[in-house]
Structure formats: structure tokens, C-alpha cells
């Protein structure tokens, strides 16, 4: 099995969502997890211990394993992410331009039929999930 398949099969059974992962050229495997209510250090330790054993059995080659929360500016990858974070601000970069524009910053209105709706400057734009190159939450800090 490949790393993504292992993570997608293992993490939900432990009560966590796979947000993203990366394997660096230096061999560091970074796994970003989330769950309702957020991630604690204990969660990271639990997942690290479990995945270390699974990767040993599956003979996955890596040097270091890092488990982390996705952070306040977490990536948005699936339709469920856009539904969950509706009402919050996001930055979306598209693969193909929409009305001559590829970068959008605005409020997520929702996601239906694999189409994300985002509003900004009094306009509303619909973006197909297949046209999204990168999307991240843009947290607001009020002082």
C-alpha cells in the first residue's frame, strides 16, 4: 500500500481526519491531522506511535515522522472542508482563470455538487473543485 492509502484507512479508525501529508526529499514524513475540537499534543503522540508501527509492518521508508495539526490557515481540499468552514474567509487559487482572475480571497458561502461558492467585494463566484489548485483558510484576528 502507498502512504496515502495507509493514512486514509488508519486515521479515521483512530478518530482523526487526514488533512494532508508530505514526504520531503530529506525523508521527513509530515502528517497533518484534525478532529472536532482540535488536536492536542497527546493526539499527536498517539497517532505517531500508531503510525510508526503500521509503517514498520507496511515497510514504508522514511527518516522522521512528524504529526501536526493543520494550523489556523489549514488547507481546504475536499467538498466537506468547504461545507464545514462555510462562513469563514479563505484564499483560493485556481488552475484556470475565472473572468481573468486566478486568486480569490473571500467568504466561503458553501459547496454543492463539487462547486465552491465564495463571495468578495459584493460579488459571488462559483469555482469547481477540479479547478482549485490551492485553498486555505484565512483566519481573522480582531484586536
From Swiss-Prot:
The record's CDD domains line, in alphabetical order, gives: YlxS_C
Compartments in which it is found: Cytoplasm
**Swiss-Prot/TrEMBL keywords:** Cytoplasm, Ribosome biogenesis
The organism's superkingdom is given as Bacteria
Which GO BP terms apply?
Answer: ribosomal small subunit assembly; translation
| Gene Ontology CC terms, in alphabetical order | cytosol
Kindly give the InterPro entries that the UniProt entry links to this protein. Ribosome_maturation_RimP (IPR003728), RimP_C (IPR028998), RimP_C_sf (IPR036847), RimP_N (IPR028989), RimP_N_sf (IPR035956)
* A Pfam family reported for this protein in Swiss-Prot or TrEMBL: RimP_N
Function in brief? Required for maturation of 30S ribosomal subunits.
Q: What family does the database annotate?
A: Belongs to the RimP family.
| Name listed for the protein in its UniProt record | Ribosome maturation factor RimP
Classification lineage:
Bacteria, Pseudomonadati, Pseudomonadota, Betaproteobacteria, Neisseriales
The primary gene name is: rimP
Amino acid at each position: 500500500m502507498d502512504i496515502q492509502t495507509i493514512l486514509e484507512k488508519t486515521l479515521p479508525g483512530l478518530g482523526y481526519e487526514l488533512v494532508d501529508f508530505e514526504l520531503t526529499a530529506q525523508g521527513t514524513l509530515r502528517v497533518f491531522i484534525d478532529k472536532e475540537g482540535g488536536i492536542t499534543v497527546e493526539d499527536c503522540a498517539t497517532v505517531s506511535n500508531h503510525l510508526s508501527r503500521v509503517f514498520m509492518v507496511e515497510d514504508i521508508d522514511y527518516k522522521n515522522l512528524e504529526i501536526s495539526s493543520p494550523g489556523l490557515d489549514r488547507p481546504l481540499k475536499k467538498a466537506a472542508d468547504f461545507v464545514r468552514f462555510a462562513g469563514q474567509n479563505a484564499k483560493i487559487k485556481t488552475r484556470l482563470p475565472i473572468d481573468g482572475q486566478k486568486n480569490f480571497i473571500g467568504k466561503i458561502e458553501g459547496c454543492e455538487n463539487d462547486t465552491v461558492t465564495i463571495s468578495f467585494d459584493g460579488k459571488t463566484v462559483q469555482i469547481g473543485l477540479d479547478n482549485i489548485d490551492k485553498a486555505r483558510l484565512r483566519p481573522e484576528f480582531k484586536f
